[in-house]
């Protein structure tokens, strides 16, 4: 399935605790039987997310690379993506048949975006626990990502969030760009995200 342009590179961003690593895990497990998959994780001072994915058996350890960005995680996915590009080059060399590489950013805010040199497709993850107003606050993560994932929908009643309001605001802020609701802990919404990647990413 490898494209002539190399593997599809999917950037996964979002605030701390929104569910980025959970999404990466679920996507790896959902796609690894059909596609050759690898992951690059970004953490500020540790490789905790990479270790977590290996521990959860999302992929074998040779397919997961953790990079330590230091300081500001935005720089490693936007202004100077060289550390991530080096990790991707290493994966491509080690596993030449790769179809998909997920690049999980460090915890960031609504202003974070991926450099087009780094990611072909971007997914931005937010959580209903952050508040009903998050979609209408905008920011590049909300408005410019190829897919917005609104996670932890099961917790909406407990944090007094109206999912209909979030749905309406997300649609308004994103124009024609799609968004999905998910409960990643239970795997809800994962199939929709995989279908999006297959259609939008040309897999």
Curated annotation (Swiss-Prot):
It comes from the Bacteria. The lineage of its organism: Bacteria, Pseudomonadati, Pseudomonadota, Alphaproteobacteria, Hyphomicrobiales. Belongs to the SIMIBI class G3E GTPase family. UreG subfamily. Facilitates the functional incorporation of the urease nickel metallocenter. This process requires GTP hydrolysis, probably effectuated by UreG. Pfam families: cobW. GTP binds at residues 14-21. Gene3D superfamilies: P-loop containing nucleotide triphosphate hydrolases. Coiled coil: none annotated. Homodimer. UreD, UreF and UreG form a complex that acts as a GTP-hydrolysis-dependent molecular chaperone, activating the urease apoprotein by helping to assemble the nickel containing metallocenter of UreC. The UreE protein probably delivers the nickel. One of its GO terms (molecular function) is GTPase activity. This is Urease accessory protein UreG. GO terms for biological process: urea catabolic process. Keywords: Chaperone, Cytoplasm, GTP-binding, Nickel insertion, Nucleotide-binding. InterPro entries: CobW/HypB/UreG_nucleotide-bd (IPR003495), P-loop_NTPase (IPR027417), UreG (IPR004400). It is found in: Cytoplasm. GO terms for cellular component: cytoplasm.
